[in-house]
Amino acid sequence: AVCQKSAAVVKDYDTSEVLNRKIAEYALAVVKDKPSFHISFIMNVSPNCDCWNHNDAAIVPDLGIAASFDPVALDCACADLVKAAPSLVGNAISDKDSVQTCTCGHHHHKGEDKFRLVHPDTNWEAGVEYGEKIGLGTRSYELVKI
């Protein structure tokens, strides 16, 4: 990775599945047997990691803030919200297949995995699947809009 603090390093032999599982293990080590509450700001969703010194325009409109005591459920809910949202124009996924532009100024990749549209070889789901398996949380959630 390009993290300036070298907190996340991907070895050449690591796959995205391995990296995402490691992230779940590290998260479990931090929260195990401790009270925790998690908040995600689903805003300025960029196509690349926030730690990069450069990035592209947001891929979806700002979707709001989500919170949960369960980090796995929170990640799943946030990913599902991004998948359900229309994609914005002028970014890394604007020219991808199956795009439909409408008069509202959005491209519609609704329901598509926008993270895979940007990075087809990345399997982000491996992290939440493994997180559930090791007891970090559950992929089931109830979305309550306020």
Model-derived regions: residue spans:
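Extended, low-polarity segments enriched in aliphatic/aromatic residues
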Residues: 1-146
